[in-house]
Amino acid sequence: MAPSSPRPALPALLVLLGALFPGPGNAQTSVSPPKVILPRGGSVLVTCSTSCDQPTLLGIETPLPKKELLLLGNNQKVYELSNVQEDSQPMCYSNCPDGQSTAKTFLTVYWTPERVELAPLPSWQPVGKDLTLRCQVEGGAPRANLIVVLLRGEEELKREPAVGEPAEVTTTVPVEKDHHGANFLCRTELDLRPQGLKLFENTSAPYQLQTFVLPATPPQLVSPRVLEVDTQGTVVCSLDGLFPVSEAQVHLALGDQRLNPTVTYGNDSFSAKASVSVTAEDEGTQWLTCAVILGTQSQETLQTVTIYSFPAPNVILTKPEVSEGTEVTVKCEAHPRAKVTLNGVPAQPPGPRTQFLLKATPEDNGRSFSCSATLEVAGQLIHKNQTRELRVLYGPRLDERDCPGNWTWPENSQQTPMCQAWGNPLPELKCLKDGTFPLPVGESVTVTRDLEGTYLCRARSTQGEVTREVTVNVLSPRYEFVIIAVVAAAVIMGTAGLSTYLYNRQRKIRKYRLQQAQKGTPMKPNTQATPP
C-alpha cells in the first residue's frame, strides 16, 4: 500500500475530542456514498457534509491517499480517495461551535484470486480406483462471495465456499473407462451480481486423465523350449483384456538379447511376434522374458529356453570307392552325449560311436550307410541323421538274362537286339561278327539274311573285360512252309495213331468178354476185365 501524505494533527485531535466530548448542539455530519464496492487499487469520490450553519472545521479521516477536489461552501467537501487496496472505513468529521459529529463510509474492495491451481493428476490412473482432486486458491475478495468449483469437463463434481488462505477444496471420484482422456479443472466464481456488478470467473490449467486396465493374469508366451545354435525360432507373446490396448508396451528379450517384435492390436488384446537367432555364445539355459507395461503397472512372464549345439553325426568310410573284395570299415561318430545307431550293425550298447567291417561285393555298389544320432535336450529327444554311399568297382558282366545267347527271328520282321553289360564303371560293349560286322544292339532293325550268324560280344572297362557269343538265326519264308508242313503232318499222324489205339483196345475188350462167357465164368457187374 502506498504511504499516505502527511496530515495535520489538529483535525485528528478535534475528531477525537468530538467523539469523546460531544457538544450539546444539533449539528450533524453526513457522508456520501455510505457504501462503496470497488476493485482493488481503485479510486472513489467521497462527499463529507455538515448541517452546521456556522463556520466549522470539516474534513475526512482515512489512511488512504486523499485529495480535496471541491469545496461547496463552508459545510460540504468532496475528496478523492485513491489506491484502495483493502476494505476501509473513512470517517467524515465536523466541529461546529455547538458540537462535534462524525459519519463513516464503508469501502469494500473486490479482486479475483491470484492463483487457482489444481494439483497435478497421476500420469495414469487404474480403472476402479478412486481419484482425489485437490484445488488451492490464493487471494480473492470478498470471500463471502467467492466459490470454488471442481469440474470434469463441464460436469460439476463439487462446489464449496473459499475458506482460509489459501483456500483448499478436495473431492474423491471413482474412475471408469469412459473417463479416459477427460479434462479436470478448478474454477473460482466471484459473484458480485447482487452488488450490481457481474460474475467473475478464474479457471486453473486443465489436466487430462489417462485411465488404464491391465489384467492380473500374466501374458501368454509361446516359444520353442529348445533351440539349436545358428538357427532361428519364433516367439509369440499375447494378452487379452487391456485398455487402452494401443498404449501397451511390449518387451521381449532372450537373456540380454532384446527382440524386436511385430505387434498386432485387437479391440482389447495384442499379439507380439518376434524372431530370435542364437549363436554358440548363447549355449545353455536362457531366460525368455515377455513384459507388458501399461500405465503404472506391468505383468511379466518368464520361460526357460535351452540353447544347444548338436552337429549331425559323421559317417566315415575307409574309402568311399573301393574295388570288389576290399574290406571297408564303416564308422559313425556323434556328439559325446548322443546315442547313435548305424544300419546293418548288430545291436551294440548305446553310445556316441559305432562301427563295423564288410567285404565289398558288387551288390554293395551304391549302398547307403545311414547313421542316426539321438540327443536329449531339456527332456526332448533331438534326432540327426547322416548318410554316406559306397561305390564298389567291379569287372564287366554278361549273362543269359541280360544278353541271351540265341535269337531266332523271321526274315523281314522288325526286331531289337538286346544285350546289356553290367559293371562299375559301366563297361563299353561291342558285338561283332567276323570281327567287323556289328550287331546293332538296342536298335530296331529289319531282319535280313545278312544279320544271321554268330557274334562275339565283348564288354570292357578299367576293371577288365568279358566276352560272350550270341547267335542270330533268320527264318526265310520256305523254311516257314516246311515247318508248317512238318507240324501239320505230325498232328495228322498223331491223330491217326490215337484212333488206331482206341479201336484195338475196344476190340480186345470184346474178345476177352466173349472168352469168359464161353467158359461159363460169371462176370462181375460194372467191372471191366483187364486185357491180357
Curated annotation (Swiss-Prot):
Record motif Cell attachment site, residues: 152-154
Give the record's GO biological process terms: cell adhesion; cell adhesion mediated by integrin; cellular response to amyloid-beta; cellular response to glucose stimulus; cellular response to leukemia inhibitory factor; establishment of endothelial barrier; leukocyte cell-cell adhesion; membrane to membrane docking
> Where the protein is mainly located, per its record?
membrane
Q: What is said about its interaction partners and assembly?
A: Homodimer. Interacts with MUC1 and promotes cell aggregation in epithelial cells. Interacts with ARHGEF26/SGEF. Interacts (on T cell side) with CD81, CD247 and CD9 at immunological synapses between antigen-presenting cells and T cells.
> Which controlled-vocabulary keywords does the entry list?
Cell adhesion, Disulfide bond, Glycoprotein, Immunoglobulin domain, Membrane, Phosphoprotein, Repeat, Signal, Transmembrane, Transmembrane helix, Ubl conjugation
Q: Which InterPro entries match?
A: ICAM, ICAM1_3_5_D2, ICAM_N, ICAM_VCAM, ICAM_VCAM_N, Ig-like_dom_sf, Ig-like_fold, Ig_sub
In its UniProt entry, what is this protein called? Intercellular adhesion molecule 1
Positions carrying Phosphothreonine are 521, 530
- As given in the record, the signal peptide range reads 1-27
User: Which Gene Ontology terms of cellular component type are present?
Assistant: external side of plasma membrane; extracellular exosome; immunological synapse; membrane raft; plasma membrane
Write out the function statement from the record: ICAM proteins are ligands for the leukocyte adhesion protein LFA-1 (integrin alpha-L/beta-2). During leukocyte trans-endothelial migration, ICAM1 engagement promotes the assembly of endothelial apical cups through ARHGEF26/SGEF and RHOG activation.
What SMART domains does the record point to? Answer: IG
Q: Which residues form the Ig-like C2-type domain?
A: 41-103, 128-193, 230-297, 325-378, 412-464
| Cytoplasmic side of membrane | 504-532
Topology Extracellular: residue spans: 28-480
Transmembrane regions listed in the UniProt entry: 481-503
* Disulphide linkage map: 48-92, 52-96, 135-186, 237-290, 332-371, 403-419, 419-457, 431-457
How does the protein associate with the membrane?
Single-pass type I membrane protein
Instruction: Describe PTMs of this protein.
Output: Monoubiquitinated, which is promoted by MARCH9 and leads to endocytosis.
A Pfam family this chain is assigned to: Ig_2
- So which domain of life are we looking at? Eukaryota
Localization per Swiss-Prot or TrEMBL:
Membrane
User: Where do glycans attach?
Assistant: 202, 267, 385, 406
Q: GO molecular function, one example?
A: integrin binding
Source organism of this protein record: Gorilla gorilla gorilla (Western lowland gorilla)
**Similarity comment:** Belongs to the immunoglobulin superfamily. ICAM family.
